[in-house]
């Protein structure tokens, strides 16, 4: 039977066992190397309150702290939430990260980004 992926969908080379992690979405237990991992970096303070805090602050240039969360998704939840997409057999060999769409102020894709995507 042919192999679908060279990595078997994992990042485990030469290790017998890998500790499991829990999916953020459905709590399914999956091996850590198989999980789809994303970093969620957000401001602790919401955007509406940033100005109020900066005006009330004693320090002139105080940098507000951020939360750093590492999110682990199982394959089915990552596909369902469109974190990763199903790709064709040829496209699966492409290891480069996909181009991120650039948005302008009106939340529309910029013409330069749309032109690149069309090529």
Swiss-Prot record:
Quaternary structure (record): Component of the small ribosomal subunit (SSU). Mature yeast ribosomes consist of a small (40S) and a large (60S) subunit. The 40S small subunit contains 1 molecule of ribosomal RNA (18S rRNA) and 33 different proteins (encoded by 57 genes). The large 60S subunit contains 3 rRNA molecules (25S, 5.8S and 5S rRNA) and 46 different proteins (encoded by 81 genes). eS26 interacts with eS1 forming part of the mRNA exit tunnel. eS26 interacts with TSR2.
Disulfide bonds, paired cysteine numbers: none
Region feature Disordered, mapped onto this chain: 1-20, 88-119
Keyword Mitochondrion among UniProt keywords: no
Annotated InterPro entries: Ribosomal_eS26, Ribosomal_eS26_CS, Ribosomal_eS26_sf
Example GO molecular function: mRNA binding
Species name: Saccharomyces cerevisiae (strain ATCC 204508 / S288c)
Protein name: Small ribosomal subunit protein eS26B
Keyword Cytoplasm attached: yes
Gene Ontology, cellular component aspect: 90S preribosome; cytosol; cytosolic small ribosomal subunit
Alphabetical list of Pfam families matching this protein: Ribosomal_S26e
């Amino acid at each position: 039977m042919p192999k679908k992926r060279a990595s078997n969908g994992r990042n485990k080379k030469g290790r017998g066992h890998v500790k499991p992690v829990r999916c953020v979405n459905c709590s399914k237990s999956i091996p850590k190397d198989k999980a789809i991992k994303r970093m969620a970096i957000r401001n602790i303070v919401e955007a509406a309150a940033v100005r109020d805090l900066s005006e009330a602050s004693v320090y002139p240039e105080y940098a507000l702290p951020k939360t750093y969360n590492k999110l682990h998704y199982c394959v089915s939840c990552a596909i369902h939430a469109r974190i990763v997409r199903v790709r064709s057999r040829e496209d699966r060999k492409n290891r480069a990260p996909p181009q991120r769409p650039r948005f302008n102020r009106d939340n529309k894709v910029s013409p330069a980004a749309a032109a690149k995507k069309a090529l």
